[in-house]
Amino acid sequence: MLKPLENRVVLRVKEEEEKSMGGIVLTSASQEKPQTAEVVAVGEGKTNHHGTLISPLVKVGDTVIFEKFAGTTVKMDGEEFLILKDSDLLAIVE
């Protein structure tokens, strides 16, 4: 499994089958990039200029919304993950 460093998080992007308004299944080329994902790993956090550790606000299992073009995609064990900084997260879905 991936263990993120500092203030990074590892996400499993939730792929959803996209359909047009008329019910036609869209190809992956015509779909919007998903912005919702499940947090699968969280780094320790990052220290500020005073030396205080600032922990990420998310935890494993959270569903989050993230910046559209943020992060780096990584494939591991046949699965695709997204690694990004916690500052690229926009919201936690409750």
Swiss-Prot record:
Pfam families attached here? Cpn10
Instruction: Supply the alphabetized keyword list.
Output: Chaperone, Cytoplasm
An example Gene Ontology molecular-function term: protein folding chaperone
One annotated Gene Ontology cellular component of this protein: cytoplasm
- SUBUNIT field: Heptamer of 7 subunits arranged in a ring. Interacts with the chaperonin GroEL.
Q: Which HAMAP family match?
A: CH10
Protein name stated in the entry: Co-chaperonin GroES
Q: What is the protein's species of origin?
A: Lactococcus lactis subsp. lactis (strain IL1403) (Streptococcus lactis)
Could you tell me the gene encoding this protein?
Answer: groES
